[in-house]
Amino acid sequence: MPAPAEVQAATLEKFIQGWAGWTPDGFLANWSEDCTQKTLPFSSGVPLRTRADTEKLFPVLMSLMSNFTLDIHNVVHDAPQGKAVIYALTKADTPFGPYRNEHAIFLWFNEIGDRVQKIEEMFDAVVMQEFLPKLDKYVADNKMQLGAKFS
């Protein structure tokens, strides 16, 4: 039996607020310890990330993206199935130019509804084709400066 709708809704709101706050601790605050994150489409070949993987990635990524804004366009919450979908636009400034992306995020709640247990996220493929090489180049060119963040 799924968790009560109001518990899931509160968790969903905390997830959105954590994302909007754009800090690693805030964004991960209501992820379960066994939460996984999968980048979509599946054909992108990006490996499944564990919470531990994300705890290493987010501080680096978030440190490179300033003036982050989140604009939520749609939220669909299917309480009987224990899941939700968020469609959002994000913007940020990076050392290598502006970042603008669209996200469709699919969330699954844990049994009691107080944590997000599974995430699947679809990004705008056109944006990512342009952004990822710039990100990779910046990280490679600044490895010494960013080194401590990668440990």
Curated annotation (Swiss-Prot):
UniProt GO MF annotations: monooxygenase activity
Top-level enzyme category: oxidoreductase
The protein's annotated pathway: Secondary metabolite biosynthesis
Domain of life: Eukaryota
Keyword set, alphabetical order: Monooxygenase, Oxidoreductase
Known EC number: 1.-.-.-
Family, as annotated: Belongs to the avfA family.
PANTHER family documented for this protein: AUSTINOID BIOSYNTHESIS CLUSTERS PROTEIN F-RELATED (PTHR39598:SF1), AUSTINOL SYNTHESIS PROTEIN F-RELATED (PTHR39598)
Reported function: Monooxygenase; part of the gene cluster that mediates the biosynthesis of the tetrahydroxanthone dimer neosartorin, which exhibits antibacterial activity. The two different monomeric units appear to be synthesized by the same set of enzymes, among which the Baeyer-Villiger monooxygenase nsrF is the key enzyme for the divergence of the biosynthetic routes. The pathway begins with the synthesis of atrochrysone thioester by the polyketide synthase nsrB. The atrochrysone carboxyl ACP thioesterase nsrC then breaks the thioester bond and releases the atrochrysone carboxylic acid from AacuL.
Entry protein name: Monooxygenase nsrQ
Organism of provenance: Aspergillus novofumigatus (strain IBT 16806)
Annotated gene: nsrQ
